[in-house]
Amino acid sequence: MRTLIQNGTVVTAQQYGAADILIKDEVILQVGENLSHQGVDQVIDAAGLLVMPGGVDVHTHLALPMFDTVSSDDHYTGHKAAAFGGTTTVMDFIPHDDHDLMPNIERWHRKAKGLAAVDYSFHMNISQFDESVLQQLEVLVEQGIPSAKMFTAYNRRMRLHDGEIFQVMRRCAEFGILPMLHAENGDVIEVLVQEAISAGHFEPVWHARTRPAWGAAEAVFRGIAIAVQAGSPLYVVHMNTAGGVDQLANAKSKGIPIFGETCPPYLFFTEEDLARPDGAKWVCSPPMRSEEDQKRIWESLEEGIMDTVGTDHCPFFFDGTTPIEYEGEWIAIPGKELGKDDFRKIPNGLPGVGDRMPVLWTTAVNTGRISPQRFVALMSTNPAKLFGMYPQKGAIQVGSDADIVLWYPEKTLNYGV
């Protein structure tokens, strides 16, 4: 099957200009101007449209168990949302429930089997530690899993201590595995949560007030320092503080291989949204920050400091007691109402995989804050490079997968919620 996309404007991380694209069997065969129709089975006229590599969202949580419920998107519904918004590759996180890594990997493959609507891959959480876990990290390479995520928060649940993180990073460096870090100060959070509860503060806004921005900034610096000592690169997930951005910029200025990701909610919402009557909708970790932090995150996108925009897509029903109709079936999954009397019990997470690209195009490209090429870099090319998918993903060039988005730059979309 040969398909020709003609008359479009091709946008990549480096280029912007007119070109046709010839595809054979889902792979790009040729890129150039005025390509021949000879032997072509299908012609797509992209006049007036932008032609971009499909989005790569490297931060999603699908069918994730949490607080006696599960996130409301599985691989089928989550992938459909991704495709609707122009994302053609997603990466999900495998929880480290069983001590040995392989049973967890096999379980997540079973969860996704037969449900995928786009290409997908996995990261591995490392939330238990001993010598055997270190030895098993080689399994990730064998299974094609390019990355391992660790946490400096969630004491007694997922957190690793600094020496353990150091050892995992050092082992990752041996195998070319990219360490990822959820950077908050778990000890400070634990103290502040107990103080809030003792004072009778159970409202959603206290989720944010007990997870301070400077604790996150400190943990970013600590993660960078540990990575340098371990001789390892580091990818810091869902960055949302001014102090964290400053640490990222400083490390990059010294040539340290540190990479940063932010997420759309941190560009548009603040801690004050959690003080609303429906504030549970905005509960995620790390939480929404101040307008000052938000301003610095925007600057990091504009100045080339931030490397990617993921979503941390992890949606929950706001009221799981009220069913909704989806594809002819009525569905109700316990959600944010589980924490209506205690912020500690609110399932953490927001949606985003379907609207990441349209929202950022509208607010960042159409407003002139970033260029179309920078948009493609953030949404597709950079994540593909960092997680071993480039140039199969994140590129429009001969030999790349034909994961191509035809983009209507002025189109208006209405999202139902």
Predicted segments with their positions:
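Divalent metal-coordination and catalytic microenvironments
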Residues: 8, 26, 48, 59, ...
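Histidine/acidic residue-rich metal-binding segments in metalloenzymes
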Residues: 132-309, 314-317, 325-330
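Short acidic/polar active-site loop segments enriched in Thr and Asp
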Residues: 87-89, 118, 146, 307
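Short catalytic-loop micro-motif centered on adjacent basic/acidic residues
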Residues: 90-92, 121-124, 233-238
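His/Asp/Glu-enriched, well-ordered alpha-helical/loop segment
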Residues: 202-231, 282, 315-411
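Metal-associated gating/positioning segment near the N- to mid-region
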Residues: 46-115, 132
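Histidine-rich, glycine-flanked metal-binding segment
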Residues: 1-53
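Alpha-helix-loop-beta-strand connector modules within alpha/beta enzyme cores
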Residues: 102-118, 166-181
